[in-house]
Design a protein with these regions (language model features):
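Short, proline-enriched alpha-helix->beta-strand connector loops that line the catalytic pocket
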Residues: 17-22, 81-87, 121-123
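C-terminal catalytic histidine-bearing segment of alpha/beta-hydrolase fold enzymes
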Residues: 87-102, 108-151
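Mobile cap/lid helix-loop segments that gate and shape the active-site cleft of serine hydrolases
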Residues: 2-7, 35-79, 85, 106
Length: 151
């Protein structure tokens, strides 16, 4: 989820190429880097502050305002727009929003919230976890084959 970074008038042939994806399939994605969102979705969230220069999560949460521009630039959730490609999100356990998770960094709570945000922006998002409803593709390979072959 990012605007195209290509430079169509560049002399550099590589720089002229689009950076946009046509689809994405990910496993256990941390779809937000915002510590406030992370704590709301999964109270025992504790990972991510190091990417912004914080040694622990409490300092990250307390210093959130100082890195809001970076969160807006790099957090997948904040980058979703109506022109984004379809995504396939795979998680190993069902979601439980607002509850502590065994693996808070890779919880399907991230997938639930990203899917909601994608739906608000008319972006196709398939969320897969054990016993998930509305799964259209048996696995990431099936999703990718369909999207990449135009079937």
């Amino acid at each position: 989820f990012h605007d195209d970074l290509c430079e169509p008038t560049s002399n550099d042939l590589v720089a002229r190429q689009s950076t946009r994806l046509c689809c994405a399939a990910v496993i256990g994605a941390q779809t937000s880097l915002d510590p406030k969102q992370m704590k709301e979705w999964t109270p025992n969230s504790k990972y991510g502050g190091h990417a912004f220069g914080f040694l622990d999560f409490k300092a990250f949460l307390n210093g959130r305002d100082s890195v809001l521009p970076l969160l807006a630039e790099y957090s997948p959730y904040s980058l979703v727009t109506k022109d984004d490609p379809p995504v396939y999100l795979i998680y190993s356990a069902p979601p439980s929003l607002g509850q502590d998770q065994r693996d808070p960094t890779h919880t399907s709570n991230f997938g639930v919230k990203l899917k909601e945000h994608c739906q608000e922006n008319d972006v196709s998002c398939e969320l897969v976890y054990p016993d998930a409803p509305d799964v259209l593709h048996a696995n990431a390979t099936a999703f990718l084959v369909e999207k990449l072959s135009g079937r």
